[in-house]
Amino acid sequence: MQQSEQIVVGRIGAVYGVKGWLKVQSFTDDPESIFEYSPWLLSQKTEREMKVVEWRRHNNGLIARLEGISDRDEAARLTGADICITADELPALADDEFYWRDLIGMRVVNTNGYDMGVVEQIMPTASNDVLVVKANSNDGFGKSERLIPFIQSEYVTAVDKEAKQIQVEWPSDF
């Protein structure tokens, strides 16, 4: 694997059975798409590249057998490991689509030019994602945090990846 930013896409769970199968917790939108990435870089105390030999759905979860792991004891050493891929393995997005990791840390400015702060995290909701913007320490309206719905063309008017800035139609005092 190339030296590139690592993205955690899942975690190895408990051992399943005696033949080296492991439960897999996927963080991908479609849980099964975690198996489209290969090899996985398992990160625990050390890092180790592993290939999935086979996988299947089990009850409401996923289980997998990894190359070179053939018994319960070998599998147990991997429990709790993060499943990582490199950022360049992520699928390309349309111009109006963004990975959360790319939005976090961006400066948010409203259409009046007021610096609202920096995206600290993103909250998923049933209807849309919400930007959690940490306000500047000298915010003129005494805000410490703003919650701004990430709805493009309604509240989010522009995202400039190169300038690391999001422009929003949002009142400065809200």
UniProtKB/Swiss-Prot annotation:
Keyword flag Plastid: no
Principal place of residence: cytoplasm
Binding partners and assembly: Binds ribosomal protein uS19.
Gene3D superfamilies from the UniProt entry: PRC-barrel domain, RimM
Start and end residues of each PRC barrel domain: 95-174
This protein's record includes keyword Nuclease: no
GO MF annotations in UniProt: ribosome binding
GO biological process terms held by the UniProt record: ribosomal small subunit biogenesis; rRNA processing
Protein's job: An accessory protein needed during the final step in the assembly of 30S ribosomal subunit, possibly for assembly of the head region. Essential for efficient processing of 16S rRNA. May be needed both before and after RbfA during the maturation of 16S rRNA. It has affinity for free ribosomal 30S subunits but not for 70S ribosomes.
GO cellular component terms listed in the entry, alphabetical order: cytoplasm; ribosome
UniProt domain comment: The PRC barrel domain binds ribosomal protein uS19.
Name of protein: Ribosome maturation factor RimM
Superkingdom, taxonomy of origin: Bacteria
Annotated source species: Idiomarina loihiensis (strain ATCC BAA-735 / DSM 15497 / L2-TR)
Organism placement in taxonomy: Bacteria, Pseudomonadati, Pseudomonadota, Gammaproteobacteria, Alteromonadales
InterPro entries attached to this UniProt entry: PRC_barrel-like_sf, PRC_RimM, RimM, RimM_N, RimM_N_sf, Transl_B-barrel_sf
Protein family: Belongs to the RimM family.
Key words, A-Z: Chaperone, Cytoplasm, Ribosome biogenesis, rRNA processing
Compartments, as annotated in UniProt: Cytoplasm
